[in-house]
Regions:
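Active-site microenvironment for binding and transforming phosphate-containing groups
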Residues: 1-173
Length: 173
């Protein structure tokens, strides 16, 4: 039996891919280190970064995550991928990346990641992100996507969040 969350995830990715009219071609991958390094590239390869941007047709950008947040962005001319964990939220990698895009045409897609229902954190992180945390039953949880969603709403940027949790979804365990 196929899990309904898996179907949602595949549908989410297919919607995004069809919007970008992707074809098979070259791939650019990242050695992700929870940094704030954003690179604009034009050829395939392995890069030391947590965000890649390209204008090169048929160059596929790869982002790998477990519980971190994969974000795909495009303004119709450029496309980018971002790997964001709590360190990425702290060092504002999303905002550093979108500075290189035309905000008036920007579209943001947030993929499956640890959601606020399950991403339990300790007091030190709770204090670092007071607007992106919740407390329930004496436990503290981080909402990784909250800052991005808030920004997109304020700037009227089109965004989509898969809302699939990689911690409690059967598709990821």
């Amino acid at each position: 039996m196929i899990n309904s969350n898996l179907i949602k995830n595949v549908e989410f990715l297919n919607r995004h891919n069809s919007k970008q009219n992707l074809k098979l071609g070259s791939f650019a991958d990242m050695n992700q280190t929870h940094s704030d390094i954003v690179l604009e590239i034009d050829k395939k390869g392995k890069y030391e970064a947590d965000a890649l941007i390209t204008e090169t047709k048929n160059l596929k950008l790869v982002v790998k995550t477990a519980d971190c947040m994969p974000v795909v962005i495009s303004d119709g001319k450029k496309v980018g991928v971002i790997h964001i964990g709590w360190k990425g939220v702290e060092n504002k990698i999303f905002f550093k990346t979108i500075k290189k895009f035309n905000l008036s045409n920007l579209k943001v897609s947030i993929g499956p990641h640890a959601q606020k229902c399950c991403y339990e954190i300790k007091d030190d992180l709770f204090k670092k992100f007071p607007e992106s945390t919740i407390e329930k039953q004496s436990k503290k949880y981080l909402d990784l996507s909250k800052e991005i969603e808030r920004f997109c709403i304020e700037k009227s940027i089109e965004f989509e969040n898969s809302s699939i949790c990689t911690i409690d979804s059967d598709s990821f365990n």
